A protein has these predicted regions:
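Sec-dependent signal peptide recognition
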Residues: 1-7
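Gly/Pro-rich cap/lid or specificity-loop segments adjacent to the active site
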Residues: 22-292
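Bacterial N-terminal signal peptides
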Residues: 7-15
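Selective for proline/serine-rich intrinsically disordered segments
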Residues: 1, 14-15, 88, 203
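P-loop NTPase catalytic cores that bind/hydrolyze ATP
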Residues: 286-314
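Sec/Tat signal peptide C-region and signal peptidase I cleavage site
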Residues: 16-20
């Protein structure tokens, strides 16, 4: 065989075979790489699309194409009752959120498929989001400015925003279940996703085999109404542990009092501080005021890893 022909033959053997599409019910899944926003990381899953009417009352009207993700079971004969992952926010895309949460579903995937679908308004092609000027993200906007920005954002949409509520979004979940030909689902919801899960169970009780709610948002609670109260309780507990531990107190004093001292200083003397952008590494100037201190404390209190850093960071900031 001539060298060129031999090389071509070897190259053909080295090309991995094209994965066969997986068909579940009416949906055909193919391999896809899902990106994690803000990082360069991608994860390999399987994806399909589901077309639904924007308005359930107008089935022949405008259509939305929702992205569906599948973390396939490892078993060659998976159980019929799948796990449904519902993202939080509100506003998170499930196909952007699941990759970072996938590790927590590893054991479930031994025998069951895990499916997830972008809630209407959160995914590519139907995302209800506005590009605010970067200066407004760096400097705290006044209440009046935020209201004006919200009105301008709303006016820019060509969508019927009344059709992007929780009570309408769960109809897409039921459409997904029926398209998959699945029996009742094992539904997982986190944060705002717990409200979606509860609403789905309310409207479609026969579609739910089990319900797992992580960080429950009761249906009757106005979103955001208890954030400050819960944050205060969390910070007292987190920072109080340091104050009660002799070695931590010796190193960092009373972090809770330090936090409020920083808050008071930022309130009376807000400062502009240079920080490296984590994505571009370019230096940006951010306004450090009372609101910024509260936001930083809240976000660091979200997970044990970052919460453990609060006494050190507060001490250094002070």
């Amino acid at each position: 065989m001539k060298p060129l022909l031999l090389s071509l033959a070897l190259a053909a053997l080295l090309v991995p075979p094209q994965a066969e599409a997986r068909r579940i019910g009416q949906l055909e899944f193919a391999d896809c790489d899902l990106a994690q926003p803000g990082t360069g990381a991608t994860s390999r899953f399987e994806c399909a699309t589901l077309e639904v009417p924007e308005s359930p009352d107008k089935p022949d009207g405008r259509k939305l194409v929702l992205k569906v993700g599948l973390a396939a079971a490892r078993s060659s004969e998976p159980a019929a009752d799948m796990v449904l992952f519902i993202a939080g926010g509100p506003g998170q895309s499930a196909t952007e959120t699941f990759p970072s949460a996938a590790g927590g579903f590893a054991r479930l995937r031994e025998k069951r498929h895990v499916v997830f679908i972008d809630q209407r308004g959160t995914g590519e092609g139907h995302r209800l989001a506005c590009d605010f000027p970067e200066v407004m993200t760096d400097v705290a906007a006044s209440d009046e400015q935020q209201v004006e920005m919200a009105r301008d954002c709303l006016a820019s949409f060509d969508a019927d925003v009344a059709q992007y509520t929780t009570s309408v979004a769960v109809k897409d979940i039921e459409a997904l279940r029926q398209a998959l030909g699945a029996p009742a689902l094992n539904v997982y919801g986190g944060s705002y996703g717990t409200r979606v899960a509860q609403e789905y169970a309310r409207q479609y009780p026969d579609g739910v085999r089990s319900l797992l709610l992580d960080g429950v948002v009761p249906p009757g609670l106005a979103l955001g109404s208890e954030h400050s109260i819960n944050l205060e309780a969390a910070l007292k507990a987190i920072l109080g542990r340091c104050a009660d531990e002799p070695a931590c107190r010796e190193a960092f004093g009373d972090p809770y009092r330090t936090l409020y001292a920083l808050r008071d200083r930022a309130r009376s003397q807000p400062a502009t501080v240079p920080v490296p952008d984590p994505r571009s590494f370019a230096t940006r100037e951010l306004r450090l005021d009372e609101s910024a201190v509260a936001v930083i404390a809240r976000l660091f209190a979200y997970s044990p890893e970052t919460a453990a850093l609060l006494p050190l960071l507060l001490d250094e900031a002070n």
